[in-house]
Each structure stands twice: as structure tokens, then as C-alpha cells.
């Protein structure tokens, strides 16, 4: 798995949590009553978030 900086990780999880809160489908099975932020963190840990990071070369 790719190593992200803490800033990249925060941006990815925050953006995905916002998407989930706005109605995007969750890509993993999550328990009932979980918050969008918790769901985004679980997706990040499993490596299934459909967001890419482009770094300058």
C-alpha cells in the first residue's frame, strides 16, 4: 500500500466522509449506525477509497 503523509490522509478521509454524508454509497460492509467519518476511516484502512493523490515529480 502507498504511504501517505498525515496531510494527505486527512484530506482523503475528509473528502470521502463528505461524499458519504452527501449520499455516496459506502464501498464496504459497515455496521448500522456508523458515522460517515468512521465509514471513511474503515474504507481508508482497507484501501478501497476511490481517490488518488498526484504528487509533483
Curated annotation (Swiss-Prot):
Any one annotated GO CC term: cytoplasm
Keywords for this protein: Cytoplasm, DNA-directed RNA polymerase, Nucleotidyltransferase, Transcription, Transferase
Keyword Transferase: yes
Gene3D superfamilies registered for this protein in UniProt: 3.90.940.10
Pfam families: RNA_pol_Rpb6
InterPro entries recorded: DNA-dir_RNA_polK_14-18kDa_CS, Pol_omega/Rpo6/RPB6, RPB6/omega-like_sf, Rpo6/Rpb6
Subcellular location: Cytoplasm
Reaction equation(s) it catalyzes: RNA(n) + a ribonucleoside 5'-triphosphate = RNA(n+1) + diphosphate
Enzyme Commission designation: 2.7.7.6
GO biological process, one term: tRNA transcription by RNA polymerase III
GO molecular function, one term: DNA binding
Subunit structure: Part of the RNA polymerase complex.
Family: Belongs to the archaeal Rpo6/eukaryotic RPB6 RNA polymerase subunit family.
Biological role: DNA-dependent RNA polymerase (RNAP) catalyzes the transcription of DNA into RNA using the four ribonucleoside triphosphates as substrates.
Entry protein name: DNA-directed RNA polymerase subunit Rpo6
Organism of derivation: Pyrococcus abyssi (strain GE5 / Orsay)
Species lineage: Archaea, Methanobacteriati, Methanobacteriota, Thermococci, Thermococcales
The gene coding this protein: rpo6
Amino acid at each position: 500500500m502507498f504511504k501517505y503523509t498525515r496531510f494527505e490522509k486527512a484530506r482523503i478521509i475528509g473528502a470521502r466522509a463528505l461524499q458519504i454524508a452527501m449520499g455516496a454509497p459506502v464501498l464496504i460492509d459497515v455496521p448500522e449506525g456508523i458515522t460517515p467519518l468512521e465509514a471513511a476511516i474503515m474504507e481508508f484502512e482497507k484501501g478501497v477509497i476511490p481517490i488518488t493523490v498526484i504528487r509533483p515529480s
